[in-house]
Amino acid sequence: MIRGNDPILLTPGPLTTSLATKQAMLRDWGSWDAAFNAITRSLCDDLVRIVHGEGTHVCVPMQGSGTFSVEAAIANVVPRDGKVLVPQNGAYCQRILKICKVLGRASVELPIPEDQPATAALIEEAIRRDPSITHVAQVHCETGAGVLNPLQEIAALCQRLGKGLIVDAMSSFGAIEIDARTMPFDALVAATGKCIEGVPGMGFVLVKKDVLEASQGNSHSLALDLYDQYVYMQKTTQWRFTPPTHVVAAFRTALDQFLEEGGQPVRGARYRRNCDALVQGMAALGFRAFLPAAVQAPIIVTFHAPADARYDFKTFYARVRERGYILYPGKLTQMETFRVGCIGAIDDNEMRNVVTAIGEVLREMGIKMQAPLAEAA
């Protein structure tokens, strides 16, 4: 894959981008210019098509990181007297709970072990206990540990019970199938610097037309008002406030490459090959994956840390980095673990090279693989 000579980012975003995507940022754009506005329009149309939302959903782009768009979606879709159920099995679910608190939206936490997925049965039980719940906010791929939550069954449940569904698809959009026709949702949030393989700086919300139209006045914020952003764009073709022009241009190039590759099925298959090569190679070195294969998303893999006393993550991270690979620093699980991403402009050959580099570092540090640490550090 052509990407230049930068280090390989083994993270769930930002991630390694292609050379063409990098080169797309070498041109300057006027944010009011018709050519730039046409790029924005084409992006929105293509993003809606990826989830088969033509006619039912619209795309509202938003400046900033993906979290900006998650907050915007909750603030707009959930009325001020609404109540949000948050199935919580990782760090990004916890972030949604914090957003609800800051927004003044009532929320209910549904605790789930970090190595297990949310299920429709658990969510239905929580809603039966508290019928005042109006919405469910579900992280699709919880990259704290790498769990893939079953979106289709959760979407069907919310539809059956008449509850709104907000999906954080930050780390799944473009890699894992999402079909608005069979997985009904009120709003779905993703961002440029993830599985489409753009660079960070813009999020977007795919929202049902009628839900967006009913959201006028819900937002706590001027800058994060999805309704106002959409209405202004429809009237003027422009963004309300200065957009990240270079990010948008790079995303257009990244999306073109995504479509040329074959779209979600082919992109997802490449990431699955990456994941399989990583897990198999790490197992040969003696590492054990934190999650069972049945719930492991092909986005990022969490591994138990070696039990050897000579293991120190900072040293391990630095020495792997010296070999051209940047791991995801730190852990988000209760147990001592580290994470390796499978996404970006990389393939399974690169993943095997990563495993080789990790093996070299283990030998260099004198680490002998034993049973994983059983307790939190």
Curated annotation (Swiss-Prot):
Keywords: Aminotransferase, Pyridoxal phosphate, Pyruvate, Transferase. GO terms for molecular function: 2-aminoethylphosphonate-pyruvate transaminase activity. Its cofactor is pyridoxal 5'-phosphate. It holds the Pfam family Aminotran_5. It is an enzyme of class 2 (transferase). It comes from the Bacteria. One of its GO terms (biological process) is organic phosphonate catabolic process. Disulfide bonds: none annotated. It catalyses: (2-aminoethyl)phosphonate + pyruvate = phosphonoacetaldehyde + L-alanine. The keyword Transferase applies. InterPro entries: Aminotrans_V_dom (IPR000192), NH2EtPonate_pyrv_transaminase (IPR012703), PyrdxlP-dep_Trfase (IPR015424), PyrdxlP-dep_Trfase_major (IPR015421), PyrdxlP-dep_Trfase_small (IPR015422), SP_NH2Trfase/AEP_transaminase (IPR024169). Its EC number is 2.6.1.37. Gene3D superfamilies: Aspartate Aminotransferase, domain 1, Type I PLP-dependent aspartate aminotransferase-like (Major domain). Signal peptide: none annotated. The modification N6-(pyridoxal phosphate)lysine is found at residue 194. Homodimer. Belongs to the class-V pyridoxal-phosphate-dependent aminotransferase family. PhnW subfamily. Involved in phosphonate degradation. This is 2-aminoethylphosphonate--pyruvate transaminase. It comes from Cupriavidus necator (strain ATCC 17699 / DSM 428 / KCTC 22496 / NCIMB 10442 / H16 / Stanier 337) (Ralstonia eutropha).
